[in-house]
């Protein structure tokens, strides 16, 4: 009977360990999703075909971050009205095989850096699409995030209210 009791104890211990492992795994998965949603509340934008208005939510750090596409590749974008062009990290530009044109110097939050001018065939944010967008390949951009500058944003009307930013196609007949 003592052997039988030991087997039950081992089974109970195994089930308890499996329960805790499952609980820790689920907790980690939930926390990771929660953290990602705080950083990029616009990760799952619908790609509508009509080019209708797109409303983005500000993230926990006060920035507008969204998942979009560069030449068909899904990327994380930080909307930056202070950037003249769409700035692409050098490693992402390499992966997308972006053409590197003239060398240029760029002012960033971390000082001046040397990079190259490029042209992006297509930039997509939700249902908003722009083609032949001037861009720059910038070494040293952290985290693989694309800075979505005015060479894209300037093609749309922007309206900010509270913690939301709405982008829409300009009305016909306006500037």
How would you describe each model-predicted region?
Residues 1-76, 81-175:
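Pepsin/retropepsin-fold aspartyl endopeptidases
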């Amino acid at each position: 009977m003592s052997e039988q009791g030991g087997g039950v104890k081992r089974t109970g211990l195994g089930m308890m360990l499996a329960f805790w492992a499952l609980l820790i795994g689920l907790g980690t998965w939930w926390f990771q999703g929660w953290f990602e949603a705080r950083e990029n509340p616009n990760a799952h934008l619908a790609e509508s075909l009509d080019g209708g208005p797109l409303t983005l939510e500000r993230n926990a750090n006060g920035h507008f971050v969204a998942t979009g596409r560069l030449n068909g590749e899904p990327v994380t974008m930080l909307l930056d009205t202070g950037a003249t062009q769409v700035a692409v990290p050098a490693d992402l530009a390499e992966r997308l095989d972006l053409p590197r044109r003239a060398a240029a110097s760029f002012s960033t939050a971390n000082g001046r850096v040397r990079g190259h001018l490029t042209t992006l065939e297509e930039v997509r944010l939700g249902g908003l699409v722009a083609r032949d967008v001037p861009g720059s390949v910038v070494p040293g951009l952290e985290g693989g995030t694309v800075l979505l500058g005015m060479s894209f944003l300037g093609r749309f009307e922007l309206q900010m209210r509270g913690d939301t930013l709405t982008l829409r196609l300009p009305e016909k007949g306006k500037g």
